[in-house]
């Protein structure tokens, strides 16, 4: 039996808990999962890498690859292509719907298309790729001191390094700049990193569990 998981129409950090709850219930019910994104109207980098992490978790359960229906709105579908989502998604999902040909955008508001992070070398490549373009936007458009942009690169590096050190599997990162009219009415840069790995506790337990004994926990 196929279990349906609706992808929120507005898929970002605010709607992710709703999506995660639906995913959890569907997994508990058993059967093949169908992620339905046909009605998607917008997705932040958080939503895109979160959907990939859900597909990764579904594959880890075993059985057939989860299904994914693509957005039907041409503009939304085009953005997902430009953001590099489908290049990663095709390794996890059986995709239903026509995906237009195209490559991730080289110069646009997508500072870093969805990019796989599996090893330390990937982290260095990600930071090197994005640093110059990010600096131009952070200092030129957001008015941040150029020296302070180093903190942006460090935050990106640390977030990606957590995948390498604590996930026990691969993950993804995406970075985008856009005008956030609804909440801030200004231009923002969003970093999103996700994986469906074992997490901090399980990754540290072999060394820290014995050290702290009964005091070891979340």
Model-derived regions, located:
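Helix-loop-beta hinge of the Bergerat
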Residues: 105-143, 208-218
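Conserved beta-strand-loop-beta-strand hairpin that lines the nucleotide-binding pocket
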Residues: 72-82, 87, 164-218
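Amphipathic alpha-helical interaction surfaces in cytosolic regulatory modules
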Residues: 7-90
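A contiguous, low-structure linker/loop signature
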Residues: 78-121
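Conserved ATP-binding N-box helix of the HATPase_c
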Residues: 46, 52-55, 146-182
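A short mid-domain helix/strand-loop element embedded in enzyme catalytic domains
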Residues: 123-141, 145-155, 184-190, 194-197, ...
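Phosphate/oxyanion-binding active-site loops and adjacent basic polyanion-contact surfaces
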Residues: 11-18, 43-47, 119-130, 151-152
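Short beta-strand/loop segment at the start of cytosolic alpha/beta domains
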Residues: 1-5
